[in-house]
C-alpha cells in the first residue's frame, strides 16, 4: 500500500496533500476551518445538484417548483433546507477562516491570500445568484437593487445593467442566466480551491507563533485527519440542529411570497452574511461612492500584506493590535445588525460611524499599533 501511495501518479498527489504533508505540530482548532469549508462546498454541490433536478428556471414556475420540491419530492424539504442553511454555515466558516488569517498574519503568504480573496468574491457571487432563484419577493427585489448598483458606473453603467438583466428589468432572461451561473460557479470554485491549496503547499502552513516551524513538523495523517474529523462532527451537529429545528431562522419571511414587480417590500435586504457590506454601501449617500465602498470592504483584505508594520507575524504576542482586532470584529457585528435595520435615525448615523471605524482600524490604527509595539519591544 505504501508503494502505491508514494508511486502512483494520482494517489501520490493526494498523499503529498493529505497524508505525508509536513504540518506544524502546534496549529490550533482555528486551522480546522479550511477542511470544514471543503465539506461545506461538497454539501452545497451535492444538495444543489439534486435541487437542480426538480427546479425550473422560469419566472412562471420557479416559485412553485421550489414549493413542489419541499412538498412532493422525497426528502425534498431536507435537501432544500440543507442547501439554504449550508450557505450560512459556509459563510460562518469563511468569516472564521479569514479572521484566523488576519489574526495570525497568514496574509503574508501573498499568493495563497490573494487566491482566497478571489474565492471569497466567487462564493459571494454564487450565494447572491442562488438567493434569486426561489423567485420570492426578496429574491426579485434583492436582484433588482444589487444589479442596479452597476448603473453607478459612469458612461457604460445603464447599458451594463440592461445587458446583465437581458432586458429592461429583472425578468425571465435574468433568472435563467442566474441559474446557469449559479450551477457552474461551484465547480469553478472547486478548481480555485485546488489552486489555493497548491499555493499553500508551496510555503507550508503558518502557525500560532508565526515562527518558522520547519524543525518541528509532523505528518498530517493521522494527527490532523483525526482533528479535522472532530471539527467535521461538530459542524455537522450544529448544521443539522439548524436545518432540522430552525430551518427558517436565518431566512426572510418575504421570500415565502411570490415575486411581484408591482409591490415593493418595506425593507429590501440581502441574506445575513452580506449585511455588513450592505450597511457600508448604504452609509454613503452617493451611489457610486457606496458601490466603491462596498467593493473596497472586501478588496481591502488585499492591502493587508502592505499594511503590516510589525516585526512579528502574528498577533499572539501583540496586545495593542489584538485590542484593535477585537474592536474590528465587534464593528463588523454592529455593521451586520445595522444592515438589517430600516434606513432611519439612529441607524443611519450608527452605520456611518461603524463604516468609518471599519476602514480606519484596518488602514490606520492597526499599522500604527504595530509600530508602537515594535518600539515598546525595541524591535526596530
Curated annotation (Swiss-Prot):
It is a multi-pass membrane protein. CDD domains: cytochrome_b_C (cd00290), Cytochrome_b_N (cd00284). GO terms for biological process: mitochondrial electron transport, ubiquinol to cytochrome c. The chain crosses the membrane at residues 33-53, 77-98, 113-133, 178-198, 226-246, 288-308, 320-340, 347-367. One of its GO terms (molecular function) is ubiquinol-cytochrome-c reductase activity. Its cofactor is heme b. Keywords: Electron transport, Heme, Iron, Membrane, Metal-binding, Mitochondrion, Mitochondrion inner membrane, Respiratory chain, Transmembrane, Transmembrane helix, Transport, Ubiquinone. The keyword Transcription does not apply. GO terms for cellular component: mitochondrial inner membrane; respiratory chain complex III. It is found in: Mitochondrion inner membrane. Its main location: mitochondrion. A ubiquinone binds at residue 201. Heme b b562 binds at residues 83, 182. Heme b b566 binds at residues 97, 196. PROSITE patterns: CYTB_CTER (PS51003), CYTB_NTER (PS51002). Pfam families: Cytochrom_B_C, Cytochrome_B. Heme 1 (or BL or b562) is low-potential and absorbs at about 562 nm, and heme 2 (or BH or b566) is high-potential and absorbs at about 566 nm. The cytochrome bc1 complex contains 11 subunits: 3 respiratory subunits (MT-CYB, CYC1 and UQCRFS1), 2 core proteins (UQCRC1 and UQCRC2) and 6 low-molecular weight proteins (UQCRH/QCR6, UQCRB/QCR7, UQCRQ/QCR8, UQCR10/QCR9, UQCR11/QCR10 and a cleavage product of UQCRFS1). This cytochrome bc1 complex then forms a dimer. Belongs to the cytochrome b family. Component of the ubiquinol-cytochrome c reductase complex (complex III or cytochrome b-c1 complex) that is part of the mitochondrial respiratory chain. The b-c1 complex mediates electron transfer from ubiquinol to cytochrome c. Contributes to the generation of a proton gradient across the mitochondrial membrane that is then used for ATP synthesis. This is Cytochrome b. The gene is MT-CYB.
